């Protein structure tokens, strides 16, 4: 039996054991007169990191825990155990039941509705075995770093390169009679190097990630791209304070959309801590703008057959023609808002932002003409309650659709409400490595504070 086949057989055997553990825990809680939900996630993996062509770290992981929530009427108790023996599971259930007796009643607590459960969960092909040993992982990390160090003489140091390989089992069950599980895999290779001269150093990184090992970009691609990004940042200039159009590069643009996701999530809404309160069915983005959620795309990083409450995930239009179609609610926040769960316990699943411009970043730069291309943001200056947005940024100054020079040490500021409404275009240079898949986004105007 090949190593990959062997590890798959072991994982499948482990899956059956974990299913039995979950069933046992649910059964114990039910016998005690409670309703319950139980989740187990077990992850095993290998991480190898290297720096300056020497191995720094080899790490094997094998982590897992069973978490149980019990509901006695309107009272809830939680407990967890990493020991999955029958006696340990019994102790965890008893602990959760004991805690429930002392918690305040909450009429919104409890399992998600039975008719929302994923009793027939689709196989999304999230598990792909690969024969990766320490030697292979080391070779990939070293190759990526070497490619970066050799790409340009201005690259003078390294933060290192690392390869990660992880496989996992997720099992979820509850007293509605739901019991589902799936296997998953994830592989990634990353590199970060430093360029420039003393007192004027810049660093950047590049990575590739996939559920399938053979779909990763090559180590050469990772290393050379990493070096290219660093070199392009060398000798940045500062800008004077001004108000100009701004392009958020695709992997930074995902952040803008994630702030939007936070603002329409049930937790923010029922606490009245969102700048998009009472905006369901209203225009929040330009009329050409649409976001679809597709949780069942095969082999994708953010695909999932059910959320962390066992609710089946399904295709949804989040925004259509700029109009907000849905909030993102769990069973708890849904009850608080008088709505049904949308299957978003645990986050969002494959958001696809529809581009309205072909030709990638080049076409978007041309459309902007003169302005700022943001390639990096830093700091915590985002307030979901008020929509205030103010973050440190770096990127490139653009004139006549052409990049002129790198810029750094600037602050960009605006209101998220305005930033969303003032989007002019989304390019088709889609970032596929995130749960939000969007191209670069052009905004009408933002305030830039510099010198």
Curated annotation (Swiss-Prot):
Any one Gene Ontology MF annotation carried by this entry is: metallopeptidase activity
Swiss-Prot/TrEMBL keywords: Cytoplasm, Hydrolase, Metalloprotease, Protease
Broadest EC class assigned to this enzyme: hydrolase
Give the location in the cell: Cytoplasm
Main localization of the protein?
A: cytoplasm
One GO location term (cellular component): cytosol
SUPFAM superfamilies, per database record: Putative modulator of DNA gyrase, PmbA/TldD (SSF111283)
In the Enzyme Commission scheme, what number(s) does this protein have?
A: 3.4.-.-
Any one Gene Ontology BP term: proteolysis
What's this protein's family per the entry? Belongs to the peptidase U62 family.
Q: Record's PANTHER family?
A: METALLOPROTEASE PMBA
User: What is its biological role?
Assistant: Probable metalloprotease.
Name of the protein in its database record: Metalloprotease PmbA homolog
